[in-house]
């Protein structure tokens, strides 16, 4: 009888333990589900916040006491993308409020992307029917529209730069003083600095010799292009050339070296970072700026199959551009897009 009681008690204890374990597991599972849901909601909110940050083109950030006593910076950003040309303009406008200077001050950083639009084409009507269109030049143009009260006082980069990477820092200090240096870093403890940094391997940056107080232009031009074990100049008609019997007019890509070996600016595109420093007379309330991003394309024409016909090179034969007009309100420190258009078959030509 005692043994039966012990068995019943043990059985009851086992059931109780199992029920308690199940309840604990269910509670833990519910707690985990709650945590996962909270995490998901947190991630969703973060993603929504990030999307708002990306789509909010009128960003505003004020940093007091950054330019000496009572100085501050107001930052705005405008982004314009054109699907037809596959070009994106992203401009940062930094308004510098300096009580020791009698003019408005503005830094404009021109960023974004100019996609390569690398293309292999077939043109059966020509003997050299297999074509390669590649971006031989990229151009960024900035000009003040019909307003002599707003002037460009400095720019980055300057002159000609042939290094694979470009790094420069612009620094503004109270009283309208400014300076620029190579590399990334602040030039003084009591100043506001802005840096530019971009890659241009196998290309050169050239600031136009015709730049003035209302117009600046930069060209990023292909030089000696390295791909695989080859190095050929942009002016060489044998650039990217491949003579093979498997190439046909139906497969123009086979008449050229593998595109995966091409330099990044040929294969993918260019991400500019150019800077302009401007001053404005305080009697002038608004100024418009016209910004143009352009892609120039060379065309290489090869004949498919085994042959002895020379390839053909046509420089700056094609091009696409995006032109955007921005209006700055100096009093309210705001920026808006007032006009935009794009077109094809418009390679940049100086002059």
From Swiss-Prot:
Belongs to the aerolysin family. Residues 28-71 are annotated as: Disordered. It comes from Staphylococcus aureus (strain N315). One of its GO terms (biological process) is cytolysis in another organism. Keywords: Signal. One of its GO terms (cellular component) is extracellular region. The lineage of its organism: Bacteria, Bacillati, Bacillota, Bacilli, Bacillales. It holds the Pfam family Leukocidin. Residues 1-27 form the signal peptide. This is Uncharacterized leukocidin-like protein 2. Gene3D superfamilies: Leukocidin/porin MspA. Transmembrane segments: none annotated. It comes from the Bacteria. Residues 30-60 have a biased composition (Basic and acidic residues).
């Amino acid at each position: 009888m005692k043994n039966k009681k012990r068995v019943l008690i043990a059985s009851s204890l086992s059931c109780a333990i199992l029920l308690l374990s199940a309840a604990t597991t269910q509670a833990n599972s519910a707690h985990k589900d709650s945590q996962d849901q909270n995490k998901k909601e947190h991630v969703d909110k973060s993603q929504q916040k990030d999307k708002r940050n990306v789509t909010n083109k009128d960003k505003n950030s004020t940093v007091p006491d950054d330019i000496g006593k009572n100085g501050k910076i107001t930052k705005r950003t405008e982004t314009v993308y054109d699907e037809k040309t596959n070009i994106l303009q992203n401009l940062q406008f930094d308004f510098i409020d300096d009580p020791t200077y009698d003019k408005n001050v503005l830094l404009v950083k021109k960023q974004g992307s100019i996609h390569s639009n690398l293309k292999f084409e077939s043109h059966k009507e020509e003997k050299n029917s297999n074509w390669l269109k590649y971006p031989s030049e990229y151009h960024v143009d900035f000009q003040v529209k019909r307003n002599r009260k707003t002037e460009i006082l400095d720019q980055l980069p300057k002159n000609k730069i042939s290094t694979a990477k470009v790094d420069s820092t612009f620094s503004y200090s109270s009283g309208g003083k400014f300076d620029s240096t190579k590399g990334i870093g602040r030039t003084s403890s009591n100043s506001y600095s802005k840096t530019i940094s971009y890659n241009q391997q196998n290309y050169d940056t050239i600031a136009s010799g015709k730049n003035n107080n209302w117009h600046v232009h930069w060209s990023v031009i292909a030089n000696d292009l390295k791909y695989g074990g080859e190095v050929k100049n942009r002016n060489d008609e044998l650039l990217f050339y491949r003579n093979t019997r498997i190439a046909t007019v139906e497969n123009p890509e086979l008449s050229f070296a593998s595109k995966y070996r091409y330099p990044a600016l040929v294969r993918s595109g260019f991400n500019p970072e150019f800077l302009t420093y401007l001053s404005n007379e305080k009697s002038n309330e608004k100024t418009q700026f016209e910004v143009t991003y352009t892609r120039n394309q060379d065309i290489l024409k090869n004949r498919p199959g085994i042959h002895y016909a020379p390839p053909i090179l046509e420089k700056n034969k094609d091009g696409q551009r995006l032109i955007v007009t921005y209006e700055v309100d100096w009093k309210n420190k705001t920026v808006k897009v007032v006009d935009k258009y794009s077109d094809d078959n418009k390679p940049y030509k100086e002059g």
